[in-house]
Amino acid sequence: MNRLSLVRYTSAVALGLSTLWSAAVCAAEDAGAFDKIQQIRAGDLNIGYVDIGPRDGQPVILLHGWPYDIQSYAQVAPALAQKGYRVIVPYLRGYGTTRFLSAGTPRNGQPSAMAADIVHLMDALNIRQADLAGFDWGARTADIVAALWPQRVKSLVSVSGYLISSQQIGEKPLPPQAELSWWYQFYFATPRGEAGYRQNTHDFAKFIWHQASPQWQFSDATFAKTARALDNPDHVAITISNYRWRLGLEKGEAKYAGYEQRLAVLPPITVPTITLEGANNGAPHPAPASYRAKFTGKYEHGDLPGAVGHNPPQEDPTAFVQAVVDADRL
């Protein structure tokens, strides 16, 4: 990260809750939108989403990860709306109020399917181009949209950088310490793991939150707001499918095969991008130097200091808002 970026993101952290609370007070009506979920048919789904800010503002789509939900952006979205952005925060397939339109559609969690969902959502909302930002599954989804549909992406904010992969890569063993960090992926590869996650979804998710962000002191009330979204009837199936697909244990759907072939060569991302990394990210993640060359357009990287872990928009919303604004202006 260049010196200017270092000052910028460190300053954003220093501003802390004062800036955030100011935005929250000014945007109380917008913040209430998180309790007023809208629904729209898009592709295979009826997608639940929040839509706040001026309708003629620059669209920003914020994508959550696993096992999180749209509440990761409960403070980011109103702050961006106050800056004039139209902010859309969808539930991914298998979360919250998002539902499949047909009982016969495979409950498929492969990454390119989730990316296609976002393109379908943009089409349904008549959004030609948007700023995309995400972490965990959301970052991977945003990366894929930027790689396959760059004309639809004005800018990108991706926590942990370039997360595009392939089944061929997923089949290759890693060093023992790295394999250990993916323990839940191997657990989900077994019938016991699927049954265990179904039986203990909330406890499992809370455990992952602690592991991924070891210094994040979230409250029971904060977790409970998200836990409800994990009660989606397709959540377990989508989760298991996602991790099994990565290991090559599921083939995925034929209609996404063309996307997967293009992603397998690890295409560059050409849109203006800011990548972020939390200093205390306890989840598996690549080193920034390892993916720098994959971003061939305007680019900056920001390291978020202190206790910030795997979920920067919820752990340090001020810095995340700054990153979205800066990426939009690159």
Please provide the spans of the model-predicted regions.
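Flexible "cap/lid" subdomain of the alpha/beta-hydrolase fold that forms the substrate-access gate
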Residues: E29-F34, L45-I47, I52, P59, ...
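Conserved HGGG/HGGXW glycine-rich cap/lid loop of the alpha/beta-hydrolase fold
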Residues: D51-F100, Y291
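Bacterial N-terminal signal peptides
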Residues: T10-S22
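Short, amphipathic alpha-helical "lid/cap" segments that border enzyme active or binding sites
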Residues: A115, I240, P317-V325
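Catalytic histidine-centered segment of alpha/beta-hydrolase-like enzymes
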Residues: V308-D316
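Short acidic-hydrophobic surface loop/beta-edge motif
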Residues: K36-A42
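Bacterial N-terminal signal peptides that target proteins for export
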Residues: M1-V13
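Sec/Tat signal peptide C-region and signal peptidase I cleavage site
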Residues: A23-A27
